[in-house]
């Protein structure tokens, strides 16, 4: 037996319920916005990795360069073989790959992250739309109560 889910019209909710719903929607929106920003940053870092891979392509053995360990920390390193690259394959695991395989990994990561960005972007649009509906219902309910109070006082 499956239970069919049905929504409750916003007009039937009390101001308190609408306020709670609005608060929950804002929290979800914040969560998805943070996720979106994190994914965009990850996509940017992946692009930098692809760019660095291309920069090393023109290097020769024995060439020295500054290698970023973080956004603000660099070390001087000597390129021993311009065709071999250390690539992080997940949670701190690195593997040595040739340029083409490394580029393949970066391209797959880019594609995967781009799909995730697209998904979260769609969710964000829907959450913003939901927030607008809830806000409109809240305003309508407040105006109706104010009008009701004014007619009772008259």
From Swiss-Prot:
Keywords tagged on the record: Chaperone
GO biological process: protein folding; RNA polymerase I assembly; RNA polymerase II core complex assembly; RNA polymerase III assembly
GO CC, one annotated term: prefoldin complex
Membrane-spanning residues: none
Highest taxon of source: Eukaryota
UniProt-recorded Gene Ontology molecular function terms: unfolded protein binding
SUPFAM superfamilies with a match to the protein in the record: Prefoldin (SSF46579)
Protein family membership: Belongs to the prefoldin subunit alpha family.
Subunit-structure text: Heterohexamer of two PFD-alpha type and four PFD-beta type subunits.
Role of this protein: Binds specifically to cytosolic chaperonin (c-CPN) and transfers target proteins to it. Binds to nascent polypeptide chain and promotes folding in an environment in which there are many competing pathways for nonnative proteins.
Designated name of the protein: Probable prefoldin subunit 5
Organism of provenance: Caenorhabditis briggsae
Name of the gene this protein is made from: pfd-5
């Amino acid at each position: 037996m499956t239970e069919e889910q049905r929504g409750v019209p916003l007009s039937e909710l009390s101001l308190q319920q609408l306020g709670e719903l609005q608060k929950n929607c804002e929290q979800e929106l914040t969560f998805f916005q943070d996720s979106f920003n994190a994914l965009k940053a990850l996509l940017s870092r992946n692009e930098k990795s692809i760019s660095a891979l291309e920069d090393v392509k023109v290097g020769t053995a024995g060439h020295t360069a500054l290698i970023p360990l973080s956004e603000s920390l660099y070390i001087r390193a000597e390129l021993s073989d311009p065709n071999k690259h250390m690539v992080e394959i997940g949670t701190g695991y690195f593997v040595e790959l040739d340029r083409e395989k490394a580029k393949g990994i970066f391209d797959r990561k880019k594609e995967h992250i781009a799909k995730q960005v697209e998904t979260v972007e769609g969710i964000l649009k829907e959450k913003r739309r939901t927030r607008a509906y809830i806000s409109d219902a809240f305003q309508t309910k407040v105006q109706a109560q104010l009008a009701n109070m004014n007619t009772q006082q008259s």
